[in-house]
Amino acid sequence: MRTIKRAVHLDFHTLPGIYDFGDNFNAADFAKRLKASHIDYINMFAKCNIGYAYFPTDVGIVYPGLSFDLFGQVLDECHKEGIGVSAYFNIGLDHEMARKRRDWCVLNKEGQVIFGDRTANFFRVMCLNSGYREYMLSMIGEVVKKYPVDGVFLDCLVAEPCYGDECAELIVQNEGDPLDDPSVGQCARQTLIDFCWEVKGLLDDDMLFVPNGLSHTERVGMASHTEIECLPGEWGYDYFSAHAAFARTLAIPAVYMTGRFHASWGDFGGLKQKASLEYDAWDAVSNGVAFSVGDHLHPRDGLETATYERVKEVNR
């Protein structure tokens, strides 16, 4: 099993319609830039929250216009540079399948599948007590069989209460009340945990596994390590240290996942000053955990030079 010292987490959630998608991407240059920035591990997107796959898949939906195996090329070139790669799958969000299969979405108490802030990401969430569960298990299984990945990273494991028939029937089977809000919430939580154990069963023993969204205690015995996601520009600088202190009691390794953004995910124009990113790195080191920088890959060009010069400065 690989160990992580300095990592990068690549977010990549890309709407259709980008006509020059991947035109300037070169996987060898990508891996060499990571190596030059002293990176030894990355979380690399196999399926994003829009619902697109970035590899040839018999299960999912490839990004429209993607003409090459983006994930596979990155994996090969990173391995040549000694960099480990986990395959990233967004679980809670899949807007393409939600569009095609409304019956795979969480149904709220008012009978809606679209609710909340329509301008944000979580205006509809996928239900793992639907056909979506097997869909995702099949796609994850496809990747771990097809590629020599070093791990799997599951994201957006959201325990959104679902009042659909499948969840109601499951609650009744467990002698609960499908109209009782705490029972519905507990069903959603247990469904996530059970699904993650199913994914764990697809993986070799030496593979890293992070179910991001489960609590630290829920990950014990399941996860290879815990990643403490904290973008302090928005979340606050007191969030990480409290979680790190608790993580030290779990007897599994931990990683501090900050971001290169001034604010939070999606702050595409934001690049932290060296002192700010350096503070996060020292925060990780002083708490005895590994260090990871969250980034978002440019859909045409790949890694941005300024970002990785900054990461290189801090990791040096």
Question: Whereabouts are the PLM-identified features?
Answer:
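Loop/turn elements at helix/coil->beta-strand transitions in domains of secreted/extracellular proteins
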Residues: 2-7, 37-42, 79-86, 147-151, ...
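The substrate-binding groove and active-site-proximal loops of carbohydrate-active enzymes
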Residues: 9-25, 53-69, 117-139, 177-192, ...
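Short, solvent-exposed turn/loop segments enriched in Gly/Ser/Thr/Pro and often Arg
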Residues: 11-13, 43-51, 89-96, 153-164, ...
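Catalytic domains of carbohydrate-active enzymes, especially glycoside hydrolases
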Residues: 25-50, 146-147, 280-283, 287
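Hydrophobic targeting/anchoring helices
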Residues: 45, 150-155, 169-197, 202-316
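Aromatic-lined substrate-binding rim segments of carbohydrate-active enzymes
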Residues: 48-93
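Aromatic- and acidic-residue-enriched segments that line the glycan-binding/catalytic groove
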Residues: 54-66, 91-119, 155-180, 227
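Active-site-adjacent "subsite" loops/lids of carbohydrate-active enzymes
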Residues: 71, 87, 91-147, 197
